[in-house]
UniProtKB/Swiss-Prot annotation:
It is found in: Cytoplasm. This is Elongation factor Ts. Associates with the EF-Tu.GDP complex and induces the exchange of GDP to GTP. It remains bound to the aminoacyl-tRNA.EF-Tu.GTP complex up to the GTP hydrolysis stage on the ribosome. Its main location: cytoplasm. Keywords: Cytoplasm, Elongation factor, Protein biosynthesis.
C-alpha cells in the first residue's frame, strides 16, 4: 500500500527510528500509525536484548536534590558520544526527578523503562546501574556536587546540635567544599576506624619490609612504621585527609573549627561518592 511521507515523518519523530524502518512498519501495519509505533518498539526491544552483552563503560552520574533529600544515580552506555548526548542526559535527569518526587530508593522497572525507550531509538546498550536516596534529618544539612564531566558525584550530610547554624552561608559553603574535597581526593573510607584490620596489617608488613635494612634500633624502626601507617590512613580516610582549602588542618579538625565559629558542633553524618564504574 502507498504510505504518505508525512505519516512516515510523524512516526519517525515519535520513535526516533529511521525513515525506511518507519515506512516498512506502516506498510506492515496497513498504515495504522499506533500499531506501527507498537511494532517498532517491540522490534526495538528485541534489538536491545541482542545488545545486552555489550560493555557499557561510558555514562553519567546524575543528582536531584534539595538540602534535605537527594537522589543520585549512575547511568551507563557504550560510547562517550551517547554519554554526552542531550537526550541521554535528559533521560537521566528525568529518572532522577521521578525517583526524587516519588521517594524511590532503588532501581525499579518504572525507572528502567524510561531508559529502555531511549536505548531502542539510539540502538546502544544502556543500563541504570545504581541509585541511592539520601535523606537529612531535622538536625542535619545536605549538600552535593557533580563534576563537570558528569563522571563523579558526591552527597554529604552534616549534623549539628544547633541546626540553626545551617542557615549561615559559611557553613553551607563548607558543606559544599567538603563535597569538592571528596570528589578531588576520592577517599576510600570515611574514618580510620572503618579500615579493615587485615588491610592495615598487610600495609604494616609492607612498611616493615621497607625499613628492615635500615641501620637503626628496632624501636626506631617501629616508630617509622607507625608513622607510615598514620600517613597512609591520612591519605585514604576522608576525615583524616588534609582539607582541600586549608591543608594545615584535617577535614575533621576544619569541620570542628567551622562549627565552633558558627556557634554549634558540626560532624559528618553521611558521605556518598559515585564515580563512574566505582563507588563508595
Amino acid at each position: 500500500m502507498d504510505i504518505k511521507a508525512s505519516d512516515v515523518k510523524e512516526l519517525r519523530d515519535k520513535t526516533g527510528a529511521g525513515m525506511m524502518e518507519c515506512k516498512k512498519a506502516l506498510q506492515h501495519c496497513n498504515g495504522d500509525a499506533k500499531e506501527a509505533e507498537k511494532y517498532l518498539k517491540e522490534k526495538g526491544l528485541a534489538a536491545v536484548e541482542k545488545r545486552a552483552d555489550r560493555v557499557t563503560s561510558e555514562g553519567i552520574i546524575v543528582i536531584k536534590s534539595d538540602h534535605k533529600k537527594a537522589v543520585m544515580l549512575e547511568m551507563t552506555c557504550e560510547t562517550d558520544f551517547v554519554a554526552k548526548n542531550a537526550d541521554f542526559i535528559a533521560v537521566g535527569e528525568d529518572i532522577a526527578k521521578t525517583a526524587f518526587d516519588k521517594d524511590i530508593s532503588e532501581v525499579t522497572p518504572e525507572l528502567n523503562d524510561k531508559l529502555l525507550d531511549l536505548a531502542t531509538r539510539v540502538r546502544e546498550n544502556m543500563n541504570l546501574t545504581r541509585l541511592i536516596n539520601v535523606k537529612a534529618g531535622a538536625d542535619e544539612y545536605l549538600s552535593r556536587y557533580i563534576h563537570s564531566d558528569k563522571k563523579t558525584g558526591v552527597i554529604i550530610v552534616l549534623k549539628s546540635d544547633k541546626p540553626e547554624i545551617f542557615e549561615k552561608t559559611e557553613v553551607q559553603e563548607f558543606a559544599y567544599d567538603c563535597c569538592l574535597h571528596a570528589a578531588a581526593f576520592m577517599p576510600l573510607y570515611v574514618k580510620k576506624e572503618d579500615v579493615d584490620a587485615a588491610y592495615i596489617k598487610e600495609q604494616e608488613e609492607i612498611f616493615k619490609g621497607q625499613v628492615a635494612e635500615l641501620n637503626k634500633p628496632d624501636n626506631v624502626k617501629e616508630g617509622i612504621v607507625k608513622g607510615k601507617i598514620s600517613k597512609h590512613l591520612s591519605e585514604i580516610c576522608f576525615l583524616e585527609q588534609a582539607f582541600v582549602k586549608d591543608d594545615k588542618l584535617s577535614v575533621s579538625k576544619k569541620m570542628a573549627e567551622v562549627g565552633k565559629e558558627a556557634g554549634g558542633s558540626l560532624s559528618l553524618s553521611k558521605l556518598v561518592i559515585f564515580q563512574l564504574g566505582l563507588g563508595m
